[in-house]
């Protein structure tokens, strides 16, 4: 019979036999039973031999397989059920020499009903056909007849053999009737592997089990006539065999003799199961699906062979184990090994029709103990998972419904456990890790959200108030880290001009949401008080006598008419102020002739004292604190000078704001000018001539006189030019300005010197006008009064026309004519004197 032989172990030749090894001598060596081949055997393909070492192309008809003959960790049922396990765990099983069926191995110290048996390597000899023709049910009584004395004798014999040999390897040779002993090194590698696996296998959990009720055919009387046999293990450690012996023997199954731990395969006349393949008929097939950790063994056999059905169904739901035992544990008794759960999972026992008769009660008792142990233990796989080629899948679920249901139930029960274990391991590995999602920051969205929060009309106030920039400088956040940097950057930024009221304010420290009301100064209080008093006086006068008010208004009109011709009689320097259309010029013109009127009014007031009573030089637009005549040239020069200084100051603020504060060009306001004037820091003062009149002590007039006196003491030029609004516009201010102080006129020296020259000339003219007015008041003759220029004639004619039209007395006309003549003569004399003086100056310059 041709068969595929697996590779021999590597260390077979190098290992020597031990001196203590006792050779096995079969008791019944004279009887040799030839292996008969079945004509109906189903031959497996040659490729199946690689994954199923027990499969033979032409298997023998009758075989006995002993689980003790295999390495510890190998399954105890036929190879078609455990071939995948052998492929997965090559080091847990010995190499088998699958030889012809004619090989015979005599078995020593064994009790058989027949004289001698033939065995394949790893199998026991099988009985002749005629001995196995009895139905399997007949083995029932045989199992029950086994006594405890025989069990003890067998255990003593087995323990003595273990002490002497440890593990007794044996290998059958092709020669018929000869027995060959193998060295201890033959099983060295499987034993070494079993030592490693025993540690982790003790705590493993049984994967599946079966009960006697699942296989009713085994209870038939066919198996009742099977004699009990005892066998000393031929090769491999004895621990798993003894474990399975006690485990299944207590359950009371008439499947196999578990005391000896052997597996019997029989062949009947109608067809039998060989040790490697289904041999009953071509339709007898098996489907195997084997995985390391408790996956299901599926088998379907046709109904043609009843004996094969009984044999196969008896081993389907046996437990699968994942560990092996150490060779040093051979001295352990069967009771101790039966209590170890790892051994109960190590072997699969494939019973045959020849079963042992004393293990029925033990199997029944051990079945309940296995259920209790199943709940407490968990299976731990120590084998590495390798890809396994699946055997041919041939199913016949109709013949074995219980098998398919039990397999599916076990598969459903085990798959969640494996998944939960894998999930637990993955969770343990990745439990401490953080999320691997990349963090993304959208700066644009953040800025948009901040702007939206700031500009929201009804936004809730946040814990940190939002700071808005008051001036041109952006205000940074007040964080501890950026506090100093914010201060430095705010200093570097160019602020606005603080002298420019139209510019936005700079934030200086803390600011109130509602600014605190300014407390008016004492000067402002006095000014406001006088304004209120004047308003009340006007209201009282208008309410007391409206008729008197009308008469007074007529008198005022007459007084105004008297003052109108007076500007027609100014002197030469006064004529320069006439063409000016601004109100200060008109005031100057009216003030100059007012002085002349003051000289001649006493004469004119004699006939009509009411109309010419004490005319004044100064008015509301030309206040009495002014000491110079107003002129257009002076105003233009002052405007150009101030604009130039303002431009210099703003340019300095743009370059260096800190330096611009120390080197200011201008200062505004009465208080500031007076303060810096007392500090002797000012070089020039420009005063508006139309300041408000306040005669109270400490009022505006007193302050102006104080400023003028200080300037005269320090010999600082002061100029009266422009009005308050014009002075503010020249400084780029929208508010009226009363007084301006100049710290430095560098860069505008020409304009400054020109302004000073014009101011000196206007002041000299003012002095001459005052002298003439004093002379007229002293009673000088009319011709000595300043004559009126000829250009004033059209104004006189208009005045005369108005007087004639109003129907006034011609006496005024005569008086005005006399005055005009006197003014004309005086004007001619002044012209002559001026010409003489100018000629003298020209001569001196030459």
UniProtKB/Swiss-Prot annotation:
Q: Where is the composition biased (Polar residues)?
A: 220-232, 272-288, 321-342, 417-428, 542-551
> Which SUPFAM superfamilies does its entry note?
L30e-like (SSF55315)
The residue numbers the entry assigns to motif Nuclear localization signal are 370-380
Biased composition, Basic and acidic residues: where in the chain?
Answer: 151-165, 206-215, 527-536
Tissue expression from the record:
Ubiquitous.
Q: Any idea which residues bear Phosphoserine here?
A: 220
The residue ranges flagged as biased composition, category Pro residues, are: 783-792
| Keywords, sorted A to Z | Cytoplasm, Nucleus, Phosphoprotein, Protein biosynthesis, RNA-binding
Q: Name one GO molecular function term.
A: mRNA 3'-UTR binding
Q: Where is this region: Disordered?
A: 151-246, 266-288, 321-440, 448-467, 475-613, 774-804
Q: Please state the protein's primary subcellular location.
A: cytoplasm
Compartment list: Cytoplasm; Nucleus
Query: Residues annotated as region RNA-binding?
Result: 666-687
| GO CC annotation terms, alphabetical | cytosol; mitochondrion; nucleus; ribonucleoprotein complex
What are the GO BP annotations of this UniProt entry? forebrain neuron development; mRNA stabilization; negative regulation of nuclear-transcribed mRNA catabolic process, nonsense-mediated decay; positive regulation of selenocysteine incorporation; RNA catabolic process; selenocysteine incorporation; striatum development; translation
What the protein does comes down to: mRNA-binding protein that binds to the SECIS (selenocysteine insertion sequence) element present in the 3'-UTR of mRNAs encoding selenoproteins and facilitates the incorporation of the rare amino acid selenocysteine. Insertion of selenocysteine at UGA codons is mediated by SECISBP2 and EEFSEC: SECISBP2 (1) specifically binds the SECIS sequence once the 80S ribosome encounters an in-frame UGA codon and (2) contacts the RPS27A/eS31 of the 40S ribosome before ribosome stalling.
Q: What is this protein called?
A: Selenocysteine insertion sequence-binding protein 2
> Where does this protein come from, organism-wise?
Rattus norvegicus
């Amino acid at each position: 019979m041709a068969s595929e032989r697996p590779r021999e172990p590597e260390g077979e030749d190098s290992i020597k036999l031990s001196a203590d090894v006792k050779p096995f001598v079969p008791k019944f060596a004279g009887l040799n039973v030839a292996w008969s081949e079945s004509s109906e055997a189903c031959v497996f393909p040659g490729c199946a031999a690689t994954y199923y070492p027990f499969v033979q192309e032409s298997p023998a008809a009758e075989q006995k397989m002993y689980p003790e003959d295999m390495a510890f960790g190998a399954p105890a049922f036929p190879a078609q059920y455990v071939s995948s396990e052998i492929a997965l765990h090559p080091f847990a099983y010995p190499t088998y020499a699958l030889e012809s069926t004619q090989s015979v191995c005599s078995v020593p110290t064994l009790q058989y009903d027949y004289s001698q048996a033939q065995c394949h390597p790893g199998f026991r000899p099988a009985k002749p056909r005629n001995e196995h023709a009895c139905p399997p049910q007949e083995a029932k009584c045989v199992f029950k007849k086994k006594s405890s004395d025989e069990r003890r004798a067998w255990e003593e014999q087995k323990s003595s053999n273990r002490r002497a040999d440890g593990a007794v390897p044996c290998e059958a040779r092709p020669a018929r009737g000869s027995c060959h002993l193998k060295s201890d090194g033959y099983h060295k590698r499987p034993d070494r592997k079993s030592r490693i696996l025993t540690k982790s296998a003790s705590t493993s959990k049984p994967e599946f089990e079966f009960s006697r009720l699942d296989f009713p055919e085994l209870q038939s009387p066919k198996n009742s006539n099977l004699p009990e046999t005892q066998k000393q293990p031929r090769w491999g450690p004895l621990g798993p065999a003894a474990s399975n012996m006690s485990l299944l023997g207590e359950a009371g199954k008439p499947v196999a003799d578990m005391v000896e731990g052997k597996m019997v395969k029989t062949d009947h006349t109608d067809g039998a199961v060989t040790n490697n393949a289904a041999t009953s008929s071509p339709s007898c097939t098996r489907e195997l699906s084997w995985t390391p950790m408790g996956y299901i063994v599926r088998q379907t056999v046709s109904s043609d062979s009843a004996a094969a059905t009984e044999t196969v169904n008896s081993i389907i739901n046996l437990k699968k184990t994942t560990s092996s035992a150490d060779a040093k544990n051979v001295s352990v008794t069967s009771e101790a090994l039966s209590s170890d759960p790892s051994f109960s999972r190590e072997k699969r026992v494939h019973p045959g029709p020849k079963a042992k008769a004393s293990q029925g009660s033990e199997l029944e008792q051990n079945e309940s103990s296995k259920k209790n142990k199943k709940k407490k233990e968990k299976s731990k796989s120590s084998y590495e998972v390798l890809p396994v080629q699946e055997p041919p899948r041939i199913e016949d679920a109709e013949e074995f419904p219980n098998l398919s249901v039990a397999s599916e139930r076990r598969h459903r029960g085990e798959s969640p456990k494996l998944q939960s274990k894998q999930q637990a391991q993955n969770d343990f590995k990745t439990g401490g890790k953080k999320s691997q999602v990349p963090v993304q920051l959208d700066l644009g969205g953040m800025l948009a959200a901040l702007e939206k929060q700031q500009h929201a009309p009804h936004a809730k106030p946040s814990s940190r108030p939002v700071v808005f920039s008051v001036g041109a400088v952006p205000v940074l956040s007040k964080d501890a880290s950026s506090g100093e940097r914010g201060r430095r950057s705010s200093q570097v930024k160019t602020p606005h001009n603080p002298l420019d009221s139209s510019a936005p304010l700079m934030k200086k420290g803390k600011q109130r949401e509602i600014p605190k009301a300014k407390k008016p100064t004492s000067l402002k209080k006095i000014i406001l008080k006088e304004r209120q008093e004047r308003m009340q006086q006007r209201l009282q006068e208008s309410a007391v006598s409206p008729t008197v008010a009308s008469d007074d208004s007529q008198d005022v009109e007459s007084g105004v008419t008297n003052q109108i011709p007076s500007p027609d009689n100014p002197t030469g320097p006064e004529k320069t102020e006439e063409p000016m259309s601004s109100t200060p010029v008109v005031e100057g013109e009216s003030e100059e002739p007012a002085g002349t009127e003051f000289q001649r009014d006493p004469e004119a007031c004699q006939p009509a004292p009411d109309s010419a009573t004490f005319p004044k030089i100064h008015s509301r637009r030309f206040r009495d604190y002014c000491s110079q005549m107003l002129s257009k040239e002076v105003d233009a020069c002052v405007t150009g000078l101030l604009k130039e200084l303002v431009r210099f100051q703003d340019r300095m603020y743009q370059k260096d704001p800190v330096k611009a504060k120390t080197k200011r060009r201008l200062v505004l306001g009465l208080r500031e000018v007076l303060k810096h004037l007392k500090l002797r820091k000012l070089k020039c003062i420009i005063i508006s001539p139309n300041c408000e009149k306040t005669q109270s002590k400490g009022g505006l007039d007193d302050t102006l006189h104080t400023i003028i006196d200080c300037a005269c003491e320090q010999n600082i030029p002061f100029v009266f030019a422009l009005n308050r609004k014009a002075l503010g516009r020249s400084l780029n201010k929208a508010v009226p300005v009363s007084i301006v102080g100049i710290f430095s006129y560098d860069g505008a020296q020409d304009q400054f010197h020109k302004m000073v020259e014009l101011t000196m000339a206007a002041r000299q003219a003012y002095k001459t006008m005052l002298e003439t007015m004093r002379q007229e008041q002293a009673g000088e003759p009319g011709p000595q009064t300043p004559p009126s220029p000829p250009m004033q004639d059209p104004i006189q004619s208009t005045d005369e026309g108005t007087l004639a039209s109003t129907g006034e007395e011609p006496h005024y006309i005569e008086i005005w004519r006399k005055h005009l003549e006197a003014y004309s003569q005086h004007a001619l004399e002044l012209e002559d004197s001026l010409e003489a003086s100018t000629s003298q100056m020209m001569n001196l310059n030459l």
